[in-house]
């Protein structure tokens, strides 16, 4: 069996002058090409994990291995070249006057030759379907477009893993769907490993596997269908089940023969329409 691309082994961390651990004895793995979502309410420890993965925070106990190597001072810069982090606020990520300049910035810092740089920029912008906006100023873009440009900047560096740290939380529904569709396509077509840090279970439903965090510890782990069966347990820790999951459950209670496993409104409507058409 292939070695996991990410392995977190008994990791604990607490912030300075804090008695309670932000993350305590957390262990999990991620396979190459997997979309793994870490979900939890604010303060559950999920964003602390994201910062440890790129070396911004150092575990007090335990070990983090990425790409088969222990994450430490000697390996952190290599890891950062292979992992891209998309933050919550897209406006905090732009440094260039145009979309093209912004994508070029990280390439220049990594010493990529000019001709190769141009090729990578064109390829990355095509992958996120933003070709018409290459010479736009970032402030003229919508929130979803800005996050797609941020993803393009990461893709130009050709990473093995993308971390989305609440990357859709400030977007409207259309922008959120644009970003998630882009990520799903890259995950499926290029086998880029995706680690999604979110409190939004509708976003997490798109992942292959979920890890639920509560008070710094792993509360549950499984597929979206397995996790959503927890129902009220998730709601008690401040997580809101997707509308389609709640509505599907209520309809089944009323005797409507719906199958389980619907996570989006579109899927639920399609199933209801199919049932109606059979009458």
Curated annotation (Swiss-Prot):
Compartments, record wording:
Cell membrane
Q: Where does ATP bind?
A: 40-47
* Entry keywords, A to Z: ATP-binding, Cell membrane, Membrane, Nucleotide-binding, Translocase, Transport
- Give the enzyme class: translocase
Primary localization class, coarse: membrane
Q: Membrane-spanning regions, if any?
A: none
User: Could you tell me one molecular function GO term of this UniProt entry?
Assistant: ATPase-coupled transmembrane transporter activity
> What Enzyme Commission number(s) appear in the record?
7.-.-.-
Please name the CDD domains in this protein's record. ABC_cobalt_CbiO_domain1
Q: How does it sit in the membrane?
A: Peripheral membrane protein
Which positions fall inside the ABC transporter domain? 6-240
UniProt-listed PANTHER family: ENERGY-COUPLING FACTOR TRANSPORTER ATP-BINDING PROTEIN ECFA1, HEAVY METAL TRANSPORTER
Q: Which family does it belong to?
A: Belongs to the ABC transporter superfamily. Energy-coupling factor EcfA family.
The record's note on quaternary structure and interaction partners says: Forms a stable energy-coupling factor (ECF) transporter complex composed of 2 membrane-embedded substrate-binding proteins (S component), 2 ATP-binding proteins (A component) and 2 transmembrane proteins (T component).
Q: What is this protein called?
A: Energy-coupling factor transporter ATP-binding protein EcfA1
